[in-house]
A protein has these predicted regions:
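Extended, hydrophilic extramembrane loops/domains of integral membrane proteins
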Residues: 123, 127-164
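Acidic helix-start/capping segments at beta-turn-to-alpha-helix junctions
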Residues: 9-35
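Surface-exposed patches in mature extracellular/periplasmic domains of secreted proteins
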Residues: 10-14, 108-113, 167
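The canonical Cys-X-X-Cys-His
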Residues: 2-10, 155
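C-terminal single-pass membrane-anchor helix
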Residues: 166-173
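Membrane-proximal low-complexity regions enriched in glycine and acidic/polar residues
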Residues: 41-126
């Protein structure tokens, strides 16, 4: 919910949400999630592109039309694609988990430009992404307390799955 407003997941399809080992939504739930997004398709018989509700076979919709639009909306920074981020970053899940919880006020003597935030786990301690998590930000259906720690765990678990959606199945072979 929170990350998808800026970050893409271009290697994940909506159908993956209903597969074993992942979030395991029902097929109907995954269809409803897909249909809540507009997808550009085409061309039609007249050679024109058109918009339609998403379907299970579609990849996750990108939050921006292109790199320049993403940079313009994010102070010049391009939010990385999240679908394989835990595999691309040194430290993987542990790094992202720590990064999500590493926001602090900068130490005395450190000044930051507008739109730059201090994060004790980011290389150089400066990051363009503001802290996205706060206690109570989301509501869990099972009543789980939505702490920053819990949401960080859930985000990184989900991102590990997106990077290796069939890992569990391969391990059972």
């Amino acid at each position: 919910e929170v990350c998808s407003s800026c970050h893409s997941m271009k290697y994940v399809s909506y159908r993956n949400l209903a597969e074993k080992g992942g979030p395991e939504f029902t097929e109907e739930q995954a269809k409803a999630i897909a249909a809540s997004f507009e997808v550009m398709d085409g061309p039609n018989a007249d050679g024109e592109m058109f918009s339609r509700p998403g379907k299970l076979s579609d990849k996750f919709v990108m939050p921006y039309e292109n790199v320049k639009a993403a940079q313009a909306a994010n102070g010049g920074a391009y939010p990385p694609d999240m679908s394989v981020l835990v595999k691309a970053r040194g430290g993987g899940v542990d790094y992202i988990y720590s990064l999500l919880q590493g926001y602090e006020d900068p130490p005395v003597g450190i000044t930051l430009d507008d739109g730059v935030y201090y994060n004790k786990f980011m290389y150089g301690n400066k990051i363009k992404m503001a802290n996205q998590l706060s206690d109570g930000l989301v509501e869990y259906g099972d009543g789980t307390n939505a702490t920053i720690e819990q949401m960080s765990k859930d985000v990184t678990t989900f991102l590990m799955w997106t990077a290796e959606p069939h890992l569990e199945t391969r391990h059972k072979m």
